[in-house]
Every structure is written in C-alpha cells, then in structure tokens.
Amino acid sequence: MNKLRKLKRDTDHRQALMRNLATSLFKHGRIMTTEAKAKDLRRIAEKLITIAKKGDLASYRRVLGYLYEEDVAYDLFQKIAPRYQGRNGGYTRIIKVGPRKGDGAMMVYIELV
C-alpha cells in the first residue's frame, strides 16, 4: 500500500489536516497550499470523487464520514461528481505559484478541473 507523506505531524493531526483540505477544496473549488500537502490531497480528493460517482447511499455515507460539512458532501454528489462521469481520474490540477515569502516553501493552487 502506498503511504502519504508524514508532513511532520502525528497521525491524527495529519488526517484532520487532509479532511479539512478536502472539505475546503470541494467547498471552494480551488485552494492555495504547499506543494507537498497538495500532492497528498490530490490522491484523497480523486478517491472521494470516484466514490461519489457511484451515487448510491453507501457511497454518500462513506464520503459524509470523511468530509466535515454535510452540505459539501451533498454538493460533491449533486454538482461535482456528475461533471466527471465520462472521465476516469485526473479530476484535479496543481498549478505552481512560487515560494512562500516566510520560509521559501513552494506554494501551489490545487483546483478541480
């Protein structure tokens, strides 16, 4: 099984971070974050969209258990997933912005295609 990066956080903190980032991505459609976080988020977001494409109750409950906001999960099933019915993956895009001023970390936009 492939692992995600540790991102210098313990397991619970890292999982909460990814849940927050995924919720924000589906809520806003585009977010700015570091490159490492975006690469991990891409894997999670694409899996959630693939699950949502099934559209059944079990899939809805599975996604609802991952995302923090119920209305975001509803939008994922009603608005976002139907856009990708003819596409097999590649639902997100990462665009490099440049280094962050404070510490030089590479900042990127991750957005839904």
Swiss-Prot record:
Q: Where does the sequence pass through the membrane?
A: none
Q: Quick one: a GO biological-process term for this protein? A: translation
Subunit structure of this chain's protein: Part of the 50S ribosomal subunit. Contacts protein L32.
Entry's InterPro entries? Answer: Ribosomal_bL17, Ribosomal_bL17_CS, Ribosomal_bL17_sf
Keywords, in A-Z order: Ribonucleoprotein, Ribosomal protein
Q: Which family does it belong to?
A: Belongs to the bacterial ribosomal protein bL17 family.
Alphabetized GO MF terms: structural constituent of ribosome
One Pfam match, given by its short name, reads Ribosomal_L17
Query: Gene Ontology cellular component?
Result: cytosolic large ribosomal subunit
According to UniProt, the name of this protein is Large ribosomal subunit protein bL17
